[in-house]
Amino acid sequence: MTTALWGGKVGQRSNKSEYLPSMPIGCWLLSRIRAERRMNKYLCVIWLSVLGIVSVCGDNHTDTDSLSALFNVDEVQVTARALSKDIIIPQTLRGVELQRLNSLSVADALRYFSGVQLKDYGGVGGIKTINVRSMGSQHTAVYYNGIQIGNAQNGQVDLGRFSLDNMEQIALYNGQKSDIWQPAREFGSAGNVYLTTRKPYFRECEKVHVRAQMRAGSFALANPAVGVDVRLAEGVSMTLDAEYVYSNGKYPFRYKRVLPDGQVAYDTTAVRQNGDINAVRAEAGLHHYYSNTGFWRFHLYNYYSERGVPGAIVNNVWRNGERLWDRNTFAQVQWQDEFFGRWSVRALLKYANDYTHYINYDERLLPADNQYLQQEIYLSVAQKVMLFRWWDMSLAYDFQYNHLHREDLILESREEFFHRYSHWLSLASAWNVQDYLRLQASVLMTQVDKEAPRVTPGVFLSLRPWQRIDLSINAFYKQSYRYPTFNDLYYTDMGNANLRPELARQHSVELAYRLQKKRVQNLLLSVSYYYNRVSDKIIAYPKGQQFRWTMLNLGVVKINGLDTKADMSLSLPMRFVLRLRLNYTYQTAIDVTNPSDTYYRHQIPYIPWHSGSAVAGLDYGSKRGDHYGLNYSFIYVGERYGQQENTVFNYVQPWYTHDLSLYGEWNIVQRHTLKLTLEVNNLFGQDYEVIQNYPMPKQNFRCTIAYRY
């Protein structure tokens, strides 16, 4: 159950009617069908008629964002669907949890999720992408306020460009969301990351909110940001956000290499060069909630950056000749409503325009001066009908057009155009037998250009044996399909026109337990085992330059993994609150394509066997409303290999970091607050590399002062 902006109830159902009588399941189902048959006849006719129109027209688009986390304005509180109601329990960071982390961007925060591997090239401006459960970055879709962020060029999203300053929640789902009312395209990803920006909410007497902050730190970091929320009318509001980021990226590091016989080959201390960044982000949003179930939302986003691309350090040779300019702009509209209390419709529309300019000045490498212009149009519509109180069905259709213009400014005659038409059609059903058994099934048809359509199914189950004990057994099986990107197929010195599509099969079983008591505000324990099999897996790894990659089909990869998570909030005497968050992952991801290969059954590149994180926070709230907190975080990534062959030459050492932060927040005047945060990252100054030959910063500091009204 969720709460609308004005306190109305969205999607409320009677709990009494959900309990099974003491009769056989078959008799119970028959009685429920007879009781509601008349009521549902006209709904089914209307729904199927509209679905037929949708299938013919095809000009549709779906929204991933829902009313599952809205605001009660009068009480100024956030309500969200209980975790125990989800078949797939997401990993989430929201609100105060995000502020507590020593994180500058979304990529930094995602490191604290289990089963996630982050590719980070160092510094504020280094490109950052994620890999979930070793499936590959292209199998992980990123959604911004409910609509996927596309990149037909390379299929990867640089998460370093998304700030945490205006972020309300980050959620990671393995498989897919538990709600079948979603865009068809969402059923086709192995994992989904949902980024939700702050929505404005006001007390009855409030009309304007203002946020302003300044962050400064090591490596000449300067990061001012400002935000304004305006209440235009009842249920109508506008948001404006802007941010600037600068850093020279010059941080000290130690480069050391030891030969297999133990002799030191290189041991150098130097300062990282060409890691500077100048970036500007501006966003505007318009929100209109016109009923308890209906709203529309418009969002405009623009990001521009100029950065150096710090090169790899190989055999004590520095490469610092690469520069990168990015501009990412998109406008998106979302609308959804509910009719007759049972039929729900959601539609989305998006236009994106992305520009990239890449230059390589390094004389030791081939010169490069390339421009890329991408355009994307995305349409979707999704419908859901409640056939019975225990049975929902949904149908969704998505269409996307991508166009890429590539121009080589060195070779004037080298100009290329690529385009792609993609269609997704999904049918899903959800059954809820009391709160004991939840079952979902979906089937997705994907067609890209003139390729033959590919059908991928998914089945999800959640069993809760005891009503009074919040213990659930969750499992799913899913297939997902990924077509090679433009870079995979055509990019010079990297592309491979003979690449075959990937097909992934996921199996997962999870045991989850949740407890809420007076002192234990929230306790969540979960253990997940998963087995994934990827056919014709496409692997990308650096080839001396982080902007260029080498692409190849590995054939078959088998992935086995175990994720464990623990999350707890504990109320202590004297107004203290202790928060703990622990994650651990063990996984093997091996190439089993050809027994004659030298890397047969070797761990694939950059997948550690062991990884984990820990976050602890102690908060204190005074009687006058001031807040103070001390936060500690720890991240560990075990040994791994940087190439296909697991040899001593390709070995990448494990690394770990300790981060510490201290904050104070004061009410200086009524509704005016001032917050000061001090951070120390990599507390003990460890030398480490996330990507081989790309050294990371040692100990560094940040200070943030923020004002809110």
Regions found by a protein language model. Give the residues of each.
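A beta-strand signature from Gram-negative outer-membrane beta-barrel systems
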Residues: 164-211
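Extracytoplasmic beta-strand/coil segments of soluble accessory domains associated
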Residues: 107-148
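N-terminal periplasmic "start-of-domain" segments of outer-membrane beta-barrel proteins
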Residues: 70-101
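Outer-membrane beta-barrel signature, preferentially recognizing the C-terminal barrel domain
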Residues: 321-338, 465-534, 542-573, 604-610
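Flexible loop and strand-edge segments within Gram-negative outer membrane beta-barrel domains
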Residues: 249-251, 269-282, 287-345, 351-376
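Transmembrane beta-strands of outer-membrane beta-barrel pores
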Residues: 197, 214-220, 244-248, 290, ...
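Conserved C-terminal beta-signal and adjacent last beta-strands/turns
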Residues: 276, 287-289, 471-476, 507-509, ...
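Gram-negative outer-membrane beta-barrel transporters
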Residues: 433-436, 525, 529-533, 553-641
